[in-house]
């Protein structure tokens, strides 16, 4: 079975070739093997957002925040995901959390 890193490399190759749907499938395979693979969740949040699948993007973005609760970037990315989904209040809350975490460093 391929490693998480191998799935991710294939995702990047397919994404760079313009085949985002197949690229997403590679990350979903990685998550089937390791549901807590934060990098895959993060990439899926971006990819699903680009595909207009905002509910899926939010689901994966929230999982990243759950897996990395002390990482400001996770919440900054979540804010962008919420913005693209038209959820402005949630985006503002996520950005506030990112700023709080950054100030604690």
Q: What is each residue range found by the language model?
A:
Residues 2-33:
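Alpha-helical segment of the N-proximal tetratricopeptide repeat
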Residues 16-28, 51-63, 85-97:
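Structural signature of tandem alpha-helical TPR/SEL1-like repeats
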Residues 32, 66, 99-100:
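Amphipathic alpha-helical segments of tetratricopeptide repeats
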Residues 93, 103-105:
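Short, charged, intrinsically disordered terminal tails
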